[in-house]
């Protein structure tokens, strides 16, 4: 399934302004805003957070599947897709990221 098709299956994110990712100490390490060019990543991360309660290795693996064709592009072009790169990092390090949603 393509990323565009996958997005159609994910819960709506109209109620979200952003999502923050937190390190193990609770500090914000990233913010994904609900704006053009980022809304797809927000939808993926919000769905992962709803299913897993956090972004851990299992959630990151699922996220790479959800990002579909963009995952291969991210592997070939490190830095081009920072929200996918972050999932690779979680898998490699075994880290767990907390998630805080910001209402619209």
What is each residue range found by the language model?
Residues 20-57:
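Amphipathic alpha-helical interaction modules
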Residues 10, 48-55, 71, 91-94:
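Generic structural signal for hydrophobic core residues of well-folded globular domains
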Residues 4-27:
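Short, charge-rich, low-complexity alpha-helical interaction segments
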Residues 15-17, 58-59, 71:
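A generic short-segment signal for beta-strand/edge and adjacent turn/coil regions
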């Amino acid at each position: 399934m393509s990323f565009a098709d996958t997005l159609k299956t994910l819960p709506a994110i109209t109620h979200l302004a952003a999502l923050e990712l937190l390190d193990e100490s609770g500090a914000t390490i990233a913010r994904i805003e609900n704006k053009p060019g980022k809304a797809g990543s927000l939808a993926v991360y919000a769905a992962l957070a709803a299913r897993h309660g956090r972004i851990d290795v299992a959630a990151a693996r699922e996220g790479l599947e959800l990002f579909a064709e963009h995952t291969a592009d991210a592997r070939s072009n490190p830095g081009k897709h920072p929200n996918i790169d972050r999932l690779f990092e979680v898998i490699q390090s075994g880290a767990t990221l907390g998630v805080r949603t910001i209402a619209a």
